[in-house]
Amino acid sequence: MAAKDVKFGNDARVKMLNGVNILADAVKVTLGPKGRNVVLDKSFGAPTITKDGVSVAREIELEDKFENMGAQMVKEVASKANDAAGDGTTTATVLAQAIVNEGLKAVAAGMNPMDLKRGIDKAVIAAVEELKKLSVPCSDSKAIAQVGTISANSDETVGKLIAEAMEKVGKEGVITVEEGTGLQDELDVVEGMQFDRGYLSPYFINKPETGSVELESPFILLADKKVSNIRELLPVLEAVAKAGKPLLIVAEDVEGEALATLVVNTMRGIVKVAAVKAPGFGDRRKAMLQDIATLTAGTVISEEIGMELEKATLEDLGQAKRVVINKDTTIIIDGIGDEATIQGRVAQIRQQIEEATSDYDREKLQERVAKLAGGVAVIKVGAATEVEMKEKKARVEDALHATRAAVEEGVVAGGGVALIRVASKIAELKGDNEDQNVGIKVALRAMEAPLRQIVINAGEEASVIANSVKAGEGSYGYNAYSEEYGDMIGMGILDPTKVTRSALQYAASVAGLMITTECMVTDLPKEDKADMGAAGMGG
């Protein structure tokens, strides 16, 4: 086992504080509408330029191991805030730095660290309650656009795109961000259910100009098995041909003789057919087939429940207004499924989301809800260079998380104003002893830090503006972008309540642990022993 280096008391805390300050100083220059960029060197390719706090934090590793421990703990604050709300990473870092700096001053002055931490925790619990009272629901698309704009660093086009996407696919809809091909940002909305499986044979194509298959008012056969024998399909094909409608077959696979016969029938114009593989694998495939059945009022033909493909009738088939299939995707538009049944299915999947343990499962279930409930929107980010593209894509993703958080828990006045108002509301809070009271004051003072940092980044005098804002009431604050005072909510400067709450809770949690640190242990650097010179050979 390697030898260890151990530091105690003030020596340890000073080193840790240096690390906290180095990381936080690098992150906090990005805060607010006039925050600056940080350039991150990459071992290959062009450097990354970012205004995203957590991206900056993740890059920082310090040479001194004790300082690095402090930096890594603050990095944890930014990561946790990012995981919980998807934004507010810089605010969380600024709050943590303020609490640690003020708290360690109090420890150096002889206060009991454990009571300080208890005081800080009391203040945060009270502050979160007050934040909830200040919160306003975020329901209309104007407010959603404003939240998106603020989170994307005052980029209005991004805010509008996100609001438009949410309007089209609903609050539950899946919105994804992709790299576009042009200079302009674009929004693609896919209404209906889309899944990532294309046609099984290019001979099904009936729209050569777009390379796609389009079926109008088709019947949809859903089979949870491989189909290789055409005999199994004949009864259904004959019934569909009599009805004079096209047919879409969604099965685990269609191969061999069955696929060849379908292709020949299609090319001769006897019956219009297209076949695709069912989406997903294993149990997820069964569930997604059931989703399609719910959407199209069909039945999944599965041998598990004793149904045979040869005995399927038109009543077992689903129907939709239109189906579009290209090389990689299938879209089912306007299934004839009953709205109440679809909502029941959605509620069932939501229950599974609540119980899901892994993020991956949760994400997949969320996608299924979106496909049943609304649709899928894709925001394609446009930029002139790859460096700009990466930076912009990260901002748009942040803005998307922020708007989701706003819809979930509502919004409060932005620009650091909400925390100032909360601090004044709980100014009379008292702890069980004097040291806890100092802890409460540490937390209250730290709540001013985000506003001060926004003002400093805008090149103004922090104390003057902080005092003016404190003298005001409600959502009165300072707009650093236009350099004027006024009603923050009226000016559209909003922060999601969830983002502000998460930032405060995670900052206080980690900062409280750092204040109560008394000893730090790390590995001693290994000394490289000089290689022995090779012995001379006798001649």
Curated annotation (Swiss-Prot):
Location in the cell: Cytoplasm
GO annotation terms (biological process): protein refolding
Sequence positions that bind ATP: T30, L31, G32, P33, K51, D87, G88, T89, T90, T91, G415, D495
InterPro entries, per database record: Chaperonin_Cpn60_CS, Cpn60/GroEL, Cpn60/GroEL/TCP-1, GroEL-like_apical_dom_sf, GROEL-like_equatorial_sf, TCP-1-like_intermed_sf
The keyword Isomerase is annotated on this UniProt entry: yes
Annotated EC: 5.6.1.7
Primary localisation category: cytoplasm
Domain of life: Bacteria
Molecular functions per Gene Ontology: ATP binding; ATP-dependent protein folding chaperone; isomerase activity
One GO term describing the cellular component: cytoplasm
Protein keywords: ATP-binding, Chaperone, Cytoplasm, Isomerase, Nucleotide-binding
Purpose: Together with its co-chaperonin GroES, plays an essential role in assisting protein folding. The GroEL-GroES system forms a nano-cage that allows encapsulation of the non-native substrate proteins and provides a physical environment optimized to promote and accelerate protein folding.
Protein family per UniProt: Belongs to the chaperonin (HSP60) family.
Protein name, per record: Chaperonin GroEL
Phylogenetic lineage: Bacteria, Pseudomonadati, Pseudomonadota, Gammaproteobacteria, Enterobacterales
Gene name as annotated: groEL
